[in-house]
């Protein structure tokens, strides 16, 4: 029978799982006896002085190689077998092996021979061994030493051995208690509100006095979704306290374990257990571990505190909606309010797991492994599994795979779930519900697969070197886990279970609320781009909280294993320490806040890792993450990593195993010393890359020296391995600041130092190539491309050139974090096309500019009747400011404002999340963006409804100023609300151009319907004598380009906007004010002084008045947008031009009001940043109130109100 379902066969048979309780004991005793016999043979035949690698070490290795796999199988039953008898027998076998190893590795006679072989190598009296063999002997020697062979006095060695056996038995008993744990809590039906029905349906119904209750086990698959979703705080507290009070019998056992570890370490001559355990690991000393923990805790703490405050605010709001109050966040609240955070998470949290059915997800994960690492997984065929169920697998639910090499020879790599076993804790599928995973569980699954891969692919000479040091073991798996912080990989693996087969589809339909709907709309097969982006980004708080958890556990681990003294440890209350440390790290309280005291729970009793091989080593999870991020950043950051990258990683990391020092493995693969930079960037703790308290204030600048600067940027503050390249660049720039300080008497140099700090922090967030510094080609090009000289003259600290939504998100998060420390350097501008003229509209002095218009090749595309405007070159695609301000075009009479044609916005919010807003998803934000300027975030993509447009009749007709009255008559008649031709568009301008020395009338005419000859709507305009006409029929593109040519940039310019009622008297008055105004500035060099009239009939403003925020729904009749547009050459004329323009606007407003022809609405696209041009308030009280409400929802801290001075701001009150 071909159990492997493949034409290739393994060189040896896989292990069998056919043991009985008695056979386990017999096999274990036989293995132990064989080892003792082998060692006795060595000692009896080889004198100490004659010991060599060949006659002493090789026999030990041969015995280990044979015994290692058999021993693992015999002890495997203790945690996996469905039979309690087998579990108990396997636990007893574990005690036998533990005691036997203590006896073996405390044998002084064998230690003397091993020591002799090592000394021969050290003294080079024999031929040198290869590096792997020498490394093996060194580890073997340390193992003997740590098992008491370094203790000189025989009586102490016996004491040590006895205590080590007792220690092993205690650990096994604690584990047995944990494995047999059946704890839980009874929940009444009134306590289940919010808990998913899919979970409730799996809970056991009580009987007797609990007949109306359900039993919720404290095991993670049950308790985690319950505490995350239960609406009642009392319910959440009951569940959490039940979890924290499991295994009371382990409290004294754990205390004895800690005391014995300390005592045995001191017997070996170590200061404490932590010093013993770190001595042969990568970190080498407890002090190095403490420095790592302190560094990470310091980096994460500010954002963690912010996170807690945000969750507390959600809790307060929820309490207020229920008519109660809430003043504090507790541990049992963290998961629940984290899940309630943010619109994106709220919408997807309940259904995201539907895209990750266990078996389908596993298959997709394995396919990623196959692609990356050149392997093939073959599921053992069903017939083979059934026949082998009693021997090849230990439970009928086990899935078995064979693993083969693809690149090169068809090399067999072992049986995936026999030689290596993946044991996960999932709720079993039922006939009505499959096993569905959360995204965190998908990450965890890929993480654990990583451990299997390490086991499968490691190739060493000796079984003992197959495993790496405990503080490196997590890094390779955490690297794989990181794939699912990248949106493309999340999307690739996602697959809604209703698409798997018809049975699964029926299961899904049965979960729908509307059971009467026989044909509900199908779920998309994969998660959308927007959702996966936000899944990746919205998990920052989870990442922060996750790292806090690791800091807490690692800190507690070091506190109990590195006491100040033996007496201090004996006096230590381990339960109180556990709860106090957790509260101190999280800045959140638990039962102690409600009168329970510091012993309200004993969570240390279920701290499996500290019991099992992670004692004084839990920091490995943090160190592993640091390493993992550096590995991922080095080799797998591309969206589609190549097989070459995967094979390189497999060969240089996985294959090496523990045959050399793990730090060498890391540096060989990375090509550099490990860095915390990718880790901090992953957490988005950008402000902590260069802490703000390093930056000197003005008072410090006077005496600053280069040495002082270097001290401010010390490697200790720059993280464990430092960000030295950034440090060096900052040092050079700050040294230059110091030179300017000496030359300029210190003026503004403190500010300049802050700017350097901010720029490099941004570079750490989005990448150095995407942050242009002053003096660079990219920086200069960005400034030159502004439409107005006033904008171009501003000098930002840097220009961010994002290449993706992810870059924009990172930049926003970074700037928001910098803001926590205050300072002008944290303010920023957002630029789309850069056409607004007033200084600061989309540029900023001493801040950062996020420039969307000079970023990446255009991604505009048309699908069906929609067109997307996204990443693209300025002028070609970027219409962000135009659209957010309302926008008018020559098709507006048919379709409304430009913003009315939008079907969806994609926007980066203040918290960095990227969300879509349309009529169904976030409809309030969707409406607010239609006129609400840049108060809510950075719009990175706009999807427009499109229509087919043929050739356009268009052109400009110029006439002398003597025809002004006729022009006004024609304009008013054209703009009549009762006879407006929606295919016609007119802009009438009264223009003084110094180059021509006289005023003229210009009518820009456009007609968007195919006509023969002059359109009837324009007959009046064309009947007026003209001095030049450019009318013709041309394509839409040609017409647009011709219009753009009339508005070239590179000049000083300003605009004002006023809205008038469309009557001859009002417009005539405006014209007369203009005609008496321009003479005051007619001698200004290159002045162009224009009053532009643009029709605003009900056909435009009423068409979608209730779905935008422009506030014109209550208007009736034709209006006019009057724009004062001025350009000139010299800065020396700024004051004269500005005062003349402002006076003219005031005169026009006063005249219109006197005639009853003034409308308060101000068109944002033509407005000025002037106290009299309060654009948002001009929309009216109802719109202002609505915009304030939406701002509070999406930007409660006012990031885009306070940090972005450009645009038109929503009032504070």
UniProtKB/Swiss-Prot annotation:
<keyword id="KW-0843">Virulence</keyword>
<dbReference type="GO" id="GO:0006508">
    <property type="term" value="P:proteolysis"/>
</dbReference>
<comment type="function">
    <text>Oligopeptidase; part of the gene cluster that mediates the biosynthesis of the phomopsins, a group of hexapeptide mycotoxins which infects lupins and causes lupinosis disease in livestock. Within the pathway, phomG and phomG' are probably involved in the processing of the phomA and phomA' precursors. The pathway starts with the processing of the precursor phomA by several endopeptidases including kexin proteases as well as the cluster-specific S41 family peptidase phomP1 and the oligopeptidase phomG to produce 10 identical copies of the hexapeptide Tyr-Val-Ile-Pro-Ile-Asp.</text>
</comment>
<dbReference type="InterPro" id="IPR024080">
    <property type="entry name" value="Neurolysin/TOP_N"/>
</dbReference>
<dbReference type="GO" id="GO:0046872">
    <property type="term" value="F:metal ion binding"/>
</dbReference>
<feature type="binding site">
    <location>
        <position position="451"/>
    </location>
    <ligand>
        <name>Zn(2+)</name>
    </ligand>
</feature>
<dbReference type="InterPro" id="IPR024079">
    <property type="entry name" value="MetalloPept_cat_dom_sf"/>
</dbReference>
<comment type="pathway">
    <text>Mycotoxin biosynthesis.</text>
</comment>
<keyword id="KW-0479">Metal-binding</keyword>
<comment type="subunit">
    <text>Monomer.</text>
</comment>
<dbReference type="GO" id="GO:0004222">
    <property type="term" value="F:metalloendopeptidase activity"/>
</dbReference>
<feature type="active site">
    <location>
        <position position="448"/>
    </location>
</feature>
<dbReference type="Pfam" id="PF01432">
    <property type="entry name" value="Peptidase_M3"/>
</dbReference>
<dbReference type="InterPro" id="IPR045090">
    <property type="entry name" value="Pept_M3A_M3B"/>
</dbReference>
<dbReference type="InterPro" id="IPR016169">
    <property type="entry name" value="FAD-bd_PCMH_sub2"/>
</dbReference>
<feature type="binding site">
    <location>
        <position position="447"/>
    </location>
    <ligand>
        <name>Zn(2+)</name>
    </ligand>
</feature>
<comment type="similarity">
    <text>Belongs to the peptidase M3 family.</text>
</comment>
<dbReference type="InterPro" id="IPR024077">
    <property type="entry name" value="Neurolysin/TOP_dom2"/>
</dbReference>
<dbReference type="GO" id="GO:0050660">
    <property type="term" value="F:flavin adenine dinucleotide binding"/>
</dbReference>
<feature type="binding site">
    <location>
        <position position="454"/>
    </location>
    <ligand>
        <name>Zn(2+)</name>
    </ligand>
</feature>
<dbReference type="InterPro" id="IPR036318">
    <property type="entry name" value="FAD-bd_PCMH-like_sf"/>
</dbReference>
<keyword id="KW-0862">Zinc</keyword>
<dbReference type="GO" id="GO:0006518">
    <property type="term" value="P:peptide metabolic process"/>
</dbReference>
<protein>
    <recommendedName>
        <fullName>Oligopeptidase PhomG'</fullName>
        <ecNumber>3.4.24.-</ecNumber>
    </recommendedName>
</protein>
<keyword id="KW-0378">Hydrolase</keyword>
<dbReference type="InterPro" id="IPR001567">
    <property type="entry name" value="Pept_M3A_M3B_dom"/>
</dbReference>
<keyword id="KW-0482">Metalloprotease</keyword>
<dbReference type="GO" id="GO:0005758">
    <property type="term" value="C:mitochondrial intermembrane space"/>
</dbReference>
<keyword id="KW-0645">Protease</keyword>
């Amino acid at each position: 029978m071909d159990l492997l379902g493949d034409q290739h066969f393994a060189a040896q048979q896989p292990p069998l799982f056919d043991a009985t309780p008695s056979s386990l004991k017999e096999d274990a005793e036989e293995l132990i006896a064989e080892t003792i016999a082998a060692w006795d043979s060595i000692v009896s035949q080889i004198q100490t002085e004659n010991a060599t690698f060949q006659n002493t070490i090789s026999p030990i290795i041969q015995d280990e190689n044979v015994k290692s796999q058999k021993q693992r199988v015999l002890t495997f039953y203790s945690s996996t077998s469905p039979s309690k008898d087998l579990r108990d027998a396997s636990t007893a076998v574990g005690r036998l092996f533990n005691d036997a190893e203590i006896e073996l590795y405390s044998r002084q006679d064998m230690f003397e021979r091993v020591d002799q072989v090592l000394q021969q190598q050290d003294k080079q009296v024999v031929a040198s061994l290869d590096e792997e063999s020498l490394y093996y002997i060194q580890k073997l020697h340390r193992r003997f030493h740590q098992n008491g062979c370094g203790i000189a006095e025989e009586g102490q060695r016996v004491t040590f051995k006895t205590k080590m056996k007792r220690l092993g038995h205690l650990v096994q008993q604690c584990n047995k208690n944990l494995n047999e744990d059946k704890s839980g809590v009874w929940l009444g039906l009134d306590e289940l509100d919010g808990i998913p029905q899919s979970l409730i349906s799996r809970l056991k119904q009580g009987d007797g006095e609990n007949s109306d209750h359900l039993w919720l086990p404290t095991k993670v698959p049950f308790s985690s979704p319950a505490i995350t979703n239960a609406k009642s705080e009392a319910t959440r507290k009951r569940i959490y306290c039940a979890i924290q009070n499991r295994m009371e019998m382990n409290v004294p056992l754990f205390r004895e374990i800690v005391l014995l570890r300390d005592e045995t370490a001191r017997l070996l001559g170590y200061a404490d257990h932590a010093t013993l355990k770190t001595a042969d690991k990568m970190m080498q000393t407890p002090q190095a571990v403490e420095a790592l923990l302190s560094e990470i805790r310091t980096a994460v703490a500010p954002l963690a505190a912010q996170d807690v405050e945000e969750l507390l605010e959600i809790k307060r709001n929820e309490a207020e909606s229920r008519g109660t109050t809430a003043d504090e966040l507790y541990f049992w609240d963290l998961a629940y309010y984290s899940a309630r955070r943010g619109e994106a998470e709220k919408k997807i949290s309940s259904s995201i797991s539907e895209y990750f059915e266990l078996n389908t997800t596993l298959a997709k994960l394995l396919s990623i492994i196959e692609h990356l690492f050149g392997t093939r997984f073959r599921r053992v065929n069903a017939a083979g599994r059934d026949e082998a169920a009693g021997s090849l697998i230990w439970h009928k639910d086990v899935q078995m795979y064979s693993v083969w090499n693809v690149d090169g020879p068809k090399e067999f790599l072992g049986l995936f779930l026999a030689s290596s076993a993946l044991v996960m804790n999932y709720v079993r599928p039922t006939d009505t519900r499959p096993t569905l995973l959360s995204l965190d569980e998908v990450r965890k699954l890929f993480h654990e697969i990583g451990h299997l891969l390490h086991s499968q692919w490691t190739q060493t000479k000796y079984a003992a070197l197959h495993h790496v040091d405990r503080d490196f073991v997590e890094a390779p798996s955490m690297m794989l886990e990181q794939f699912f912080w990248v949106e493309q990989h999340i999307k690739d693996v996602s697959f809604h279970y209703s698409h798997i087969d018809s049975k699964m589809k029926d299961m899904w339909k049965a979960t729908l609320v509307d059971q009467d709907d026989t044909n509900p709309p199908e779920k998309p097969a994969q998660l959308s781009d927007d959702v996966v982006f936000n899944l990746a980004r919205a998990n920052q708080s989870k990442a922060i909280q996750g790292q806090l958890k690791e800091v807490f556990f690692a800190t507690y681990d070091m506190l109990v294993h590195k006491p100040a003294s033996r007496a201090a440890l004996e006096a230590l209350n381990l339960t109180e320490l556990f709860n106090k440390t957790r509260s101190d790290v999280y800045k959140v309280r638990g039962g102690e806040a409600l009168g329970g005291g510091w012993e309200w729970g004993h969570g240390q009793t279920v701290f499996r890792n500290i019991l099992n091989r992670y004692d004084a080593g839990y920091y490995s999870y943090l160190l592993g993450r640091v390493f993992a991020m550096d590995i991922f950043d080095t080799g797998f950051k591309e969206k589609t990593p190549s097989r070459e990258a995967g094979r390189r990683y497999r060969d240089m990391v996985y294959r090496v195993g523990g045959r050399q020092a793990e730090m060498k493995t890391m540096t060989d693969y990375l090509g550099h010393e490990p860095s915390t930079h990718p880790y901090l960037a992953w957490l988005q703790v950008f402000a902590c890359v260069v802490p703000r308290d390093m930056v000197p204030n003005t008072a410090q600048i006077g005496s600053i020296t280069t040495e002082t600067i270097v001290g401010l940027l010390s490697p200790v503050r720059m993280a464990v391995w430092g960000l030295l390249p950034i440090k060096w660049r900052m040092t050079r720039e700050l040294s230059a600041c110091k030179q300017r300080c000496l030359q300029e008497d210190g003026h503004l140099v403190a500010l300049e130092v802050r700017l350097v700090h901010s720029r490099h922090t941004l570079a750490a967030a989005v990448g150095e190539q995407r942050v242009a510094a002053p003096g660079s080609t990219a920086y200069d090009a960005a400034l030159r491309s502004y439409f107005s000289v006033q904008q171009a003259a501003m000098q930002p600290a840097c220009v961010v050139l994002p290449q993706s939504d992810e870059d924009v998100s990172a930049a926003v998060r970074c700037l928001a974090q910098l803001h926590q420390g205050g300072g002008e350097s944290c303010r920023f501008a957002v630029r789309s096309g850069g056409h607004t003229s007033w200084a600061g509209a989309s540029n900023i002095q001493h801040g950062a500019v996020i420039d969307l218009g000079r970023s990446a090749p255009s991604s505009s595309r048309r699908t069906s009747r929609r067109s997307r405007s996204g990443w693209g070159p300025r002028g070609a695609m970027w219409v962000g400011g135009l659209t957010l301000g309302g926008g008018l075009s020559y098709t507006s009479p048919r379709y409304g404002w430009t913003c009315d044609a939008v079907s969806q916005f994609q926007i980066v919010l203040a918290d960095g999340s990227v969300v879509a807003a349309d009529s169904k998803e976030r409809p309030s934000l969707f409406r607010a963006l239609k006129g609400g300027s840049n108060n809510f975030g950075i719009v990175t993509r706009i999807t427009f409804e499109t229509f087919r447009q043929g050739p356009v009749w268009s052109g400009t007709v110029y006439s002398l100023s003597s025809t002004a009255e006729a022009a006004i008559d024609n304009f008013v008649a054209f703009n009549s609300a009762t006879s407006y031709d929606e295919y016609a568009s007119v802009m009438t301008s009264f223009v003084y151009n110094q180059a021509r020395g006289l005023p003229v009338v210009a009518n820009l005419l456009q007609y968007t319907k195919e006509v023969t000859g002059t359109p009837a709507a324009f007959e009046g305009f064309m009947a007026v004598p003209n001095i030049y006409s450019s009318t013709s029929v041309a394509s839409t593109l040609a017409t647009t380009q011709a219009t753009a040519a009339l508005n070239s940039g590179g000049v000083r310019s300003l605009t004002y906007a006023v809205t008038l009622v469309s009557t001859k008297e009002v417009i005539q008055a405006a014209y007369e004010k203009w005609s008496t105004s321009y003479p005051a500035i007619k001698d200004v060099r290159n002045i162009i002084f224009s009053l532009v009239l643009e029709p605003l009939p009900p056909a435009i403003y009423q068409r979608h008045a209730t779905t935008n925020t422009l506030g014109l729904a209550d208007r009736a009749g034709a209006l006019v947008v009057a724009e004062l547009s001025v350009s000139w050459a010299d800065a020396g004329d700024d004051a004269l031009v500005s005062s003349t323009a402002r006076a003219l606007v005031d005169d026009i407003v006063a005249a219109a009001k006197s005639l009853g022809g003034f409308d308060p609405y101000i068109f944002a696209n033509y407005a000025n940043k002037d106290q009299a041009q309060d654009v948002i308030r001009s929309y009216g009280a109802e719109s202002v109130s609505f915009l304030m409400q939406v701002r509070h929802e999406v930007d409660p801290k006012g990031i885009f109100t306070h940090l972005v001075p450009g645009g038109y701001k929503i009032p504070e009150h």
